[in-house]
């Protein structure tokens, strides 16, 4: 381990600031605080370190016989079959590749993408704001559906209104998530009061189980609803929810020149366009 004395560190920092031509840190009694220029430089440094780490991982993968190692991030409310179908398509193109899959909120995933910890992020674009360092592409738009368990009292009714939906407790996605924002906007536009909810959850699996064990209601995108309806887990209710959601993918500018990333992007496009479904193996 190498130790650096404070005078030597101060001298090095001064030389770095002279080289950059801008102050990078503010000096305080309790230490240093990055300036706006310092924050920017730290961001670049983190991305460089992440890229070096990813390069080491790819080299190690190649030594073990793998051709590529890619890292994908996806949000919990994304279509459950889209990313897995894209991964299968990518592995057909690169049989020896390794794929890492992370699930989190879009804000967290986009930060990791910018820092070089992820190669691609797939998620809802409803609240997405463009970022200078990222490219983005819309994959599809879809409607939102109100869902319940099979056999729910509302499933036998040919048509529903807001009053009927307010009569039951709800499972809500957390405030700030794209799907929750869409629902809140829909309620506002319809002049409706907030829906009563008992549970606020960002876990798709937990939400499905909660629906199975109760008469609570929730909301899902059309593709998610279709996917789990085919497996007998939920039923979309006969209610037209005036909400349209979007799903897309993001990647760092310039990385599409890498053949592995280019093939990963094409695999997402293929899976999105072909609506790949997995068989029910129950």
Features from the language model and the residues they span:
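A short LG(V/I)-centered, amphipathic sequence patch enriched
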Residues: 15-34
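Short beta-strand-centered segments that line the small-molecule binding cleft or hinge
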Residues: 43, 47, 62, 85-89, ...
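Flexible hinge/capping segments at coil-to-helix
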Residues: 63, 133-170, 252-254, 259-262
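Central regulatory/effector-binding core of bacterial HTH transcription factors
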Residues: 67-128, 193, 201
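A late-sequence structural motif
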Residues: 82, 235-278
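Hydrophobic hinge/microswitch elements
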Residues: 105-118, 124, 178-235
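Secondary-structure junction motif
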Residues: 124, 148, 154-155, 168-190, ...
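Beta-alpha-beta core module
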Residues: 130-138, 142, 205-254
């Amino acid at each position: 381990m190498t130790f650096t004395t404070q005078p030597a560190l101060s001298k090095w920092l001064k030389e770095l600031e002279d080289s950059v031509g801008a102050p990078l840190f503010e000096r305080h009694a309790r230490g240093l605080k990055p300036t706006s220029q310092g924050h920017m430089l730290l961001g670049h440094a983190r991305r460089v370190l992440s890229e070096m780490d990813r390069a080491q991982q790819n080299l190690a993968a190649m030594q073990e016989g793998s051709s590529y190692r890619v890292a994908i991030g996806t949000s919990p409310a994304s279509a459950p079959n889209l990313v897995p179908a894209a991964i299968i398509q990518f592995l057909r193109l690169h049989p020896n590749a390794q794929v890492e899959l992370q699930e989190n909120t879009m804000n967290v995933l986009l930060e990791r993408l910018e820092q070089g910890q992820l190669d691609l992020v797939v998620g809802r674009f409803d609240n997405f704001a463009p970022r200078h360092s990222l490219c983005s592409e819309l994959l599809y738009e879809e409607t939102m559906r109100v869902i319940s368990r099979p056999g729910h009292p509302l499933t036998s009714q040919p048509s529903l209104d807001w009053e009927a939906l307010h009569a039951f407790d709800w499972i809500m996605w957390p405030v700030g998530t794209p799907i929750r924002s869409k629902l809140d906007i829909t309620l506002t536009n319809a002049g409706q009061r907030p829906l009563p909810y008992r549970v606020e959850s960002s876990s798709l699996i937990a939400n499905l189980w909660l629906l199975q064990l109760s008469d609570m209601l929730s909301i899902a995108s059309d593709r998610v609803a279709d996917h789990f309806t085919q497996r007998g887990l939920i039923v979309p209710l006969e209610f037209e929810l005036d909400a349209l959601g979007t799903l897309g993918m993001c990647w760092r500018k310039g990385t599409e020149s890498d053949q592995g990333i280019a093939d990963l992007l094409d695999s997402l496009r293929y899976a999105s366009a072909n609506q790949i479904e997995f068989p029910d193996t129950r």
